[in-house]
Amino acid sequence: MTKKEYLQQYRRAQLEAQIILGEIEAERQRMAGVRAIIYSDMPRSHDTEHDLADAYAKYEHFVANKLRAYNHRLAIMDAVEKTIATAPTRLQYQILQLRYIEGLKWDDVAERIGKTRQWVNTVHGKALQQIRIIEPGETDTV
């Protein structure tokens, strides 16, 4: 994976994290509609699928899995932010931040910096050569 591809993970991880939170919220709302079983003397099947305890156990398992996936996405985002922070100059840092964290197009980055797109692309190339990749979970010991 190139450094550029590594930095591009940020926006994907951010989108995936938002999707995961939406899935958890949708499941929470669905579970809010689960009702307790009313027991009566009437015969009924013994299908445990409708048992409230089983439903909540499945919900907890679902949420735990989603939270693991969510935390993984956050770790990727954190690692990319730390990687960008290894840029040797403030200008390189700012260009990488605008492009990969804020997701701006090259023309918008150039406008924000007040330089030409070609100049920004040149500085970006140098920044990619000089940054150090920080893997998720790695402590930043620069």
Which role does the model predict for each range below?
Residues 1-86, 125, 129, 133-142:
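N-terminal interaction/assembly modules
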Residues 108-113:
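Short alpha-helical "recognition helix" segments of helix-turn-helix
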Residues 88-104:
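Short amphipathic alpha helix immediately N-terminal
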Residues 82-83, 96, 114:
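A general structural-boundary detector
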